[in-house]
Amino acid sequence: MTDEDLSDFLDSDGLPNNTEDVDIGNYHEGNDLNDLTGKEWIKFTKSWKIYRPRSRGQSEKDHPAKFPEELVEDFVGFFTQEDDWVLDPFMGTGSTLVGCRSMGRNAVGIELTEKYADVAKDRARQQSLNPVQLEVMNEDCRDALSNLERKFDYCLTSPPYWNMLKKSRGGVESEHKKRENEGLDTKYSDSKRDLGNIDDYEEFLDELEKIFLDVYDVLKNEGYLTVVIQNIRTEDGEMKPLAWDLASRLGETYVLKQEKLWLQDDKPLGIWGYPSEYVSNVAHHYCLIFKKVE
């Protein structure tokens, strides 16, 4: 498809023109992955996208690591069809469920921390024009996954970025310090079952790999898994390639299909290493895309 073919659909920034007369293309009867036309399909295949999260209520802000509902809508819209079932084993406050509801998909979310699960339940109960089923499980996903009775069409999730939330990164103006000063959570919980409290990197990866092997068992064949994650920097300045290490491990069971970058152009910059050492301002996440092929 050429740029000329898309000229009546996208504006100069590559975004949909906001008119009722837009030609969104034709739906292909052989498309058994999603409900998109070719013109809608091609938009998603760009390897990066900027997401700016919507404003959130106080209870949602308390969770220290959320991803945007718009991201959920894009990924769920591409990897599922209407009425399909989506799984999120690290649900947090329910962004995946909210995005699934707006897209007409059913979803199950699993969350270890009770107060976050309660927020997700409240969000799931909000009225919607889409009559979907949204289920919240306040459990450890290592226990819950083996008890699920259905197979899922897709899994979208964002696990803890190792123990990053326990470590303050930067000086007085770091995000960690800002949340601390506002009385917001700076880590998920104090539970020994919380993966974010594992201090040994290899042990953390081992536990994470086991969980996604359990996810493999409840995914339908040909179903996709998307893991939103980052490479991280330790307190002593070493980069841990968490995203790449996880991709390598899961690629032994799943087919690693691609990565898509979630870019944050509204994240404030900090002058962390000045004037003696390089420390980057990380403003992107990896959305690792895997496929189950038996």
Tell me what each language-model feature is.
Residues M1-E294:
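Class I S-adenosyl-L-methionine-dependent methyltransferase catalytic core
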